[in-house]
Regions:
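Short, glycine-/small-residue-rich phosphate/pyrophosphate-handling segment
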Residues: 90-142
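Short glycine/proline-rich, acidic loop/turn segments that cap or connect secondary-structure elements
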Residues: 137-154
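N-terminal beta1-alpha1-beta2 submodule of the flavodoxin-like/Rossmannoid cofactor-binding fold
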Residues: 1-86, 135, 148, 157-194
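Short, local alpha-helical segments
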Residues: 94-96, 154-160
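Short, flexible coil/turn micro-motifs enriched in small/turn-prone residues
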Residues: 8, 53-55, 59, 97, ...
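Gly/Ser/Thr-rich helix-start
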Residues: 12-14, 59, 65-66, 93, ...
Length: 194
C-alpha cells in the first residue's frame, strides 16, 4: 500500500477540478490510497501529509506565481524542512491559469523548488508534448506541452466547463504516474538496496 496526498489551493474551482483528476488517476492504481487536502486543512490533516509516500502540490497561477494561500502553506512547511520530515518522499505538481502561457512555468518551478527544499524527489509528467504539430489539436494529451508538471488552461469566464477534457486526462496521467512511482519507490527496502 502506498499513500498519496494531493494538497492544493483553488480560488475559483478550476484547480480543485484538476486536483480531483490527479487524485482519480492515483486512485486507479492498485495499492494506492489517496488523500485530497485543501491547503486550508493542511494543519489539521498534518498526519495524512506526514504519512504520505508522495505529495502532489497544486496551485493556480496568479500573477505569474503560486496563490497567496498556497504561499502561506509553503511557509507552513518550514517546520517539515527543519525536521527533514518529508525527506525522500516523492513529489510532483500542477497548476492552472486562464492563459495558455500565463507564466505557469514559474509556478511549477516554485512547486519544484519547495519539494527540493524539503529534500523530496520530484516526479515529472513524463508525457510527450501534444498539440505541437499540424495534425495536433487541443484535445491532445498534454496539450500545453509541459514536462515538469501539469500546466492546465481554463477559461477565466467559465467554470469547470472551461477546462478542456484533455487537461483532465493529463492530470489523471500525472496522478497515475506518481502512484506507480511511489509503489516502485517502496518496493526495495534501503537495507536491501545497499
Amino acid at each position: 500500500m502506498t499513500n498519496v496526498a494531493v494538497v492544493y489551493h483553488s480560488g475559483y474551482g478550476h484547480t480543485q477540478a484538476i486536483a480531483e483528476a490527479v487524485a482519480a488517476g492515483a486512485e486507479g492504481v492498485g495499492g494506492a490510497r489517496v488523500s485530497l487536502i485543501p491547503v486550508g486543512e493542511a494543519e489539521v490533516r498534518e498526519a495524512e501529509l506526514d504519512d504520505a509516500d508522495a505529495i502532489i502540490f497544486g496551485s493556480p497561477t496568479y500573477m505569474g506565481g503560486v496563490s497567496a494561500d498556497f504561499a502561506k502553506f509553503k511557509d507552513w512547511t518550514s517546520r517539515k524542512w527543519l525536521a527533514r520530515a518529508w525527506h525522500d518522499k516523492l513529489a510532483a505538481g500542477f497548476t492552472v491559469s486562464a492563459s495558455w502561457g500565463g507564466d505557469k512555468q514559474n509556478t511549477i518551478y516554485q512547486l519544484l523548488t519547495l519539494a527540493q527544499q524539503l529534500g523530496m524527489v520530484w516526479v515529472g509528467l513524463g508525457l510527450a508534448p501534444g498539440n505541437n504539430h499540424s495534425k495536433g489539436s487541443s484535445d491532445d494529451l498534454n496539450r500545453t506541452g509541459a514536462s515538469v508538471g501539469v500546466m492546465a488552461q481554463a477559461n477565466a469566464d467559465q467554470g469547470n466547463e472551461g477546462i478542456g477534457a484533455s487537461e483532465f486526462r493529463t492530470a489523471q496521467a500525472l496522478g497515475k504516474r506518481v502512484a506507480e512511482a511511489a509503489l516502485r519507490w517502496q518496493s526495495v527496502p534501503l537495507a536491501q538496496a545497499a
